[in-house]
Amino acid sequence: MDVNPTLLFLKVPAQNAISTTFPYTGDPPYSHGTGTGYTMDTVNRTHQYSEKGKWTTNTETGAPQLNPIDGPLPENHEPSGYAQTDCVLEAMAFLEESHPGIFENSCLETMEVVQQTRVDKLTQGRQTYDWTLNRNQPAATALANTIEVFRSNDLTANESGRLIDFLKDVMESMDKEEMEITTHFQRKRRIRDNMTKKMVTQRTIGKKKQRLNKKSYLIRALTLNTMTKDAERGKLKRRAIATPGMQIRGFVYFVETLARSICEKLEQSGLPVGGNEKKAKLANVVRKMMTNSQDTELSFTITGDNTKWNENQNPRMFLAMITYITRNQPDWFRNVLSIAPIMFSNKMARLGKGYMFESKSMKLRTQIPAEMLANIDLKYFNESTRKKIEKIRPLLIDGTASLSPGMMMGMFNMLSTVLGVSILNLGQKRYTKTTYWWDGLQSSDDFALIVNAPNHEGIQAGVDRFYRTCKLVGINMSKKKSYINRTGTFEFTSFFYRYGFVANFSMELPSFGVSGINESADMSIGVTVIKNNMINNDLGPATAQMALQLFIKDYRYTYRCHRGDTQIQTRRSFELKKLWEQTRSKAGLLVSDGGPNLYNIRNLHIPEVCLKWELMDEDYQGRLCNPLNPFVSHKEIESVNNAVVMPAHGPAKSMEYDAVATTHSWIPKRNRSILNTSQRGILEDEQMYQKCCNLFEKFFPSSSYRRPVGISSMVEAM
């Protein structure tokens, strides 16, 4: 049957069909090869936006640094990072005036967190720059290595202490004249295998001690490693993101805790809430502006876009903000919070793997590591790369580039949101002192601005004033990419608003399907995703029913568990057919055992085992859920588990689903190959730690420590 796609949309307002234009089906693009070029782009661009600043040299590391703060006021519309300190401080003061006590209360909340947080907070998170090995490692490993080195250098670090004590060690380590570290290297040798008599390459991991002088250590402590951001949809060019090392992470965490606490109290902030809560917050602001504008005023909304938000922000500005926010607090607290921005003002960007060269004629490939870029002959490079390298050379030290201005992606999302909201806050009539006024929403670098005024000239004047005010604090609203509309239709953080939020269902598409954890969890997650989308995203009953059928089909295909009476032959069909024939009540078999699907859109909230329990043969129940069955998972099963689902936008989010322990809740065994690598020792430590924890728990059931999420966790193993 031919379907004319335009007919589908005849009854649908254009805004509701917007989700069909999003690039969310199919695989997202991944980057291959080195991120060195993208990182050099970031460094060069950041310096270009601040080029009229003052150059200084860092006395400890010898790194050249550019400081654009209080630089010249912009004369054109080019993006620039010349924030004016007094303007930022004034914006902070007005923010506090409009929200009495907000900074004071947030400081008190943060102080409590600072005193209670334990070091293992830093084991959360994915890849982290491990300064001891000079490459990325899982967070738990990088932390363990750092603590080990600190210990061997007479610092008091321990894995279960308070984070604040670990940060004291970090501060002390920076004063040391030298630090001794253990590095790993691989030895390869060819030996004859006794059994097969073939030659094999044996790898051994060697360890050697290395001393870092103060300068080298500081450079490593201030280094952000860079990678290419993967899976970004709808973009032609890739871009670089940063992973900081353990020295910086703890300080950043406390600053973000403070900023998060402030954001929670600001009605214009799109962080840290999400989902329906965020939509409600936004709808309130819109309602406020529309109610006031009904008869006398015009109201327009800008769907805003900022040019290179991160690259024009400045850590020195964040330092000024923190100094102001914490001005009545005890010194120790002010010091702890001011270290993160100070470290960022002195940060170094690691250029990544370097470049790969290959000669077609001689079939040779060679890697040029980033360290060599400072003095290699440029004739080997193409023109664009040559320009990049020439530009970055004055900034290079040991394969890292000095990068004082700019923030790198995703480091101070909360704090930069506070800065954005402080400008939105200045739109109140008591501050504009004229007929126009504004309000809006800010979520990291994304914003929506609602301007009200008696006539079009007033709207224009309001937008201009907002634009110029932003320039004064280093925020550059893009005139090309922002657009203005009558209030009632706009987009903010991929939520489309048209007299209420329109469901952008395509964003959820990537999370449909089989997760690949195990048969039990996958079934549960699959139906929960469909249920959640019926609740939150306008997934209609007919579409949901179809999604469910497709999911079951996909699930059977993945686990090769087609119905017992099917003709499809797979490597499981022999066993499943036998089970089908032996079973009296066939409706009681789980789908993963070749049973029929009993789900429909009315019973998605019931776990499959519960749905079919009454229908099961007694001996099948016994095999499926008998705690003495060696295949039933013995760890205490919480009734609710968390799955990681991948929406199209933003980070992977956690989703709860019901977990019933059966023979299908298996946990795959770890891949053997880790046992031959340098990670092996870590693995053994971790198992030891786990055993001790389990013992401890048996004796003290009320103990309230957290199990570490180490590299042995499921997701890492996958």
Swiss-Prot record:
Per UniProt, residues of the RdRp catalytic domain are 286-483
Query: Which subcellular locations apply to this protein?
Result: Host nucleus; Host cytoplasm
Q: Which UniProt keywords apply?
A: Eukaryotic host gene expression shutoff by virus, Eukaryotic host transcription shutoff by virus, Host cytoplasm, Host gene expression shutoff by virus, Host nucleus, Host-virus interaction, Inhibition of host RNA polymerase II by virus, Nucleotide-binding, Nucleotidyltransferase, Phosphoprotein, RNA-directed RNA polymerase, Transferase, Viral RNA replication, Viral transcription
Catalytic activity reported: RNA(n) + a ribonucleoside 5'-triphosphate = RNA(n+1) + diphosphate
Q: What is its EC number?
A: 2.7.7.48
Give the top-rank taxon of the lineage listed in the UniProt record for this protein.
Answer: Viruses
Query: Is Amino-acid biosynthesis a UniProt keyword of this protein?
Result: no
| One GO process term, biological-process aspect | viral transcription
Q: Where is the composition biased (Polar residues)?
A: 55-64
Instruction: Show where the record puts the motif Nuclear localization signal.
Output: 187-195, 203-216
Gene3D superfamilies from the xrefs? 6.10.140.720
Question: What does the subunit comment say?
Answer: Influenza RNA polymerase is composed of three subunits: PB1, PB2 and PA. Interacts (via N-terminus) with PA (via C-terminus). Interacts (via C-terminus) with PB2 (via N-terminus); this interaction is essential for transcription initiation.
Record protein name field: RNA-directed RNA polymerase catalytic subunit
Organism annotation? Influenza A virus (strain A/Guinea fowl/Hong Kong/38/2002 H5N1 genotype X0)
The lineage, from the top, is: Viruses, Riboviria, Orthornavirae, Negarnaviricota, Polyploviricotina
